[in-house]
């Protein structure tokens, strides 16, 4: 089988590395701290923004999966160097570069998001993410690398913990039958991308030549409001109805005084105050991976949280 490099070991990086290892590939995971080896997975401690170091790690690999991101409040400062390093490593080794992206680059839109929308975001985080793909796409168009970006909405599912909007702040509480608070309008339709589908799309796109040179949306189930998702999770858990409340702006304002992460959320509040819907039909009509049925997502998520200590 082949060698794959996965940059980052958050929810998406871990899911991608384990999927590849399960398929029999050899996987090298790059993080700053490293970890103990796992079956089929070698963990390497390195700064992925160091292009010479990353190039050495990627020698012999067929693909580099970019699943890492700088700290949320440092995107504008640190994304350019990380993107440049990934591009340089792909060029030096011939590995396909698969970038895990998101939907920030589009900015606020009034329709379901498709890949042909312009990257028109004006905020610093949206511009930073748009610039990553613009930088990588230029290298691809110049014939220097082979690259693809796979864009996901907010992660949901087994393995999604602190960084998810329907994760550690919500699921353990609803499993106890307690009320939950969510960011923005709890009744606004919102697309939630299932984490196993993210990993499956990254792996599939790496090996599909027809995918390269453009961006694709990860197959994503039909949009559901936060209230609908909480209701589905509670029904699966058998806890009975759970109250869903909007986090008061005053609470967010006070918390932002002490938390850089919460402070940075102001730029993307539009994603939760209005419909935020992704159209993934282009990917699903071209490739084998399709969105996992929502009922299956809900069952697996409740089971995972219970297995990992939630009631």
What is the predicted role of each segment?
Residues 230-277, 310-311:
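Terminal hydrophobic/aromatic helix or amphipathic segment near a protein terminus
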Residues 12:
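Hydrophobic/small residue at the entry helix of a nucleotide-binding pocket
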Residues 84-131, 148:
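Conserved Rossmann-fold NAD(P)-dependent oxidoreductase catalytic core, especially the SDR/UDP-sugar
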Residues 189-196, 216-236, 245-253, 292:
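Substrate-binding strand-loop-helix patch
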Residues 102, 134-159:
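Conserved beta-loop-beta element that borders a ligand/cofactor-binding pocket
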């Amino acid at each position: 089988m082949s060698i794959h490099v996965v940059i980052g070991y958050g929810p998406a990086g871990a899911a991608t590395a384990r999927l590849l290892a399960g398929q029999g590939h050899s996987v090298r995971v790059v993080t700053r701290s490293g970890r103990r080896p796992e079956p089929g997975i070698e963990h390497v401690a390195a700064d992925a923004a160091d292009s010479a170091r990353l190039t050495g790690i990627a020698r012999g690999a067929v693909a580099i999966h970019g699943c890492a991101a700088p700290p949320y409040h440092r995107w504008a400062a640190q994304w350019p160097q990380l993107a440049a390093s990934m591009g340089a490593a792909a060029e030096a080794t011939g590995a396909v570069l698969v970038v895990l992206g998101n939907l920030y680059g589009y900015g606020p839109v009034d329709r379901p998001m498709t890949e042909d929308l312009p990257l028109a975001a004006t905020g610093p985080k949206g511009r930073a993410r748009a610039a990553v793909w613009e930088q990588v796409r230029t290298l691809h168009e110049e014939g220097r690398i082979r690259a693809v970006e796979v864009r996901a909405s907010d992660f949901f599912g087994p393995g999604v913990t602190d960084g998810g909007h329907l994760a550690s702040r919500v699921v353990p509480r609803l499993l106890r039958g307690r009320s939950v608070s969510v960011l923005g309008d709890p009744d606004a339709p919102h697309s939630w991308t299932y984490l196993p589908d993210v990993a499956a799309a990254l792996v599939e796109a790496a090996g599909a030549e027809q995918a390269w040179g453009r961006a694709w949306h990860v197959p994503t189930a039909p949009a559901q409001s936060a209230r609908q998702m909480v209701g589905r999770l509670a029904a699966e858990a058998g806890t009975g109805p759970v109250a869903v409340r909007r986090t008061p702006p005053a609470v967010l304002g006070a918390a932002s005084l002490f938390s850089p992460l919460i402070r940075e959320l102001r730029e993307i509040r539009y994603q939760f105050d209005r419909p935020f819907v992704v159209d993934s039909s282009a990917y699903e009509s071209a490739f084998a991976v399709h969105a996992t049925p929502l009922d299956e997502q809900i069952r697996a998520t409740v089971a995972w949280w219970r297995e990992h200590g939630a009631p």
